[in-house]
Every structure is written in structure tokens, then in C-alpha cells.
């Protein structure tokens, strides 16, 4: 008998938009108004150590500060807490990382990857729930 992998029960998706088109445009504007840089591989929210690797990733990123888009973070945290309560039950869930805004040029991409620090030079955040 073939069964679904156990981890698939941990995947939750929303089919109802969290933000209106107007709110999405405000988020886009906020991301575009922050300092933009070529995305690197192997770096974390401004921590040095990443490399520019066009074989793995071709995009531009910026970080949206909590204070500039507090309503966005409140909405995301509300959905995160509801999802956590309905499916996982972790204690003390809160958003600890700024949202990364990414733009891809024509032909841009980000190849398959995991978010971790393989050399463990920096203690990575514990991500119990990731939202895209």
C-alpha cells in the first residue's frame, strides 16, 4: 500500500487572499522603497557571509521594516497564529524576521534550496512556520 508522506500533513495553505490588491500594491511599494541589493546565497538579513551566485539565484531583495508596515505584520501574525492553533500547537509563536521583498528580472530565478547555515557560523532562527 502506498501512502502519502507524513510531512505532507504539515503543509497548510490558504486559498483566500490575505491582502486586497490595494494592500498588495502598498507592500510592493514598501519593498521597492527600501534599499535593494543583489540577492546572495548563504547570507541572512544583512549578516555578512553570502556570495553572489548567478547559478543558484538571480534576483534583487530588500527587507520591509516592522514599523513601516505594521498592519501587514499584524495581518500575517493573525493568520500565522490561527494556522498554528488549528494545525500545530506551538507555544509562543511570533514573527521574528522582517519580510523579504524579492524582485526577479526577466529570466531571474532562485533554485531549490534550504534556509540554513551549513557552516553554523551564525545561530539561525528557529523557524517553526514559514510563510510565502
Predicted segment positions?
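Fe(II)/2-oxoglutarate oxygenase catalytic core
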Residues: 1-130
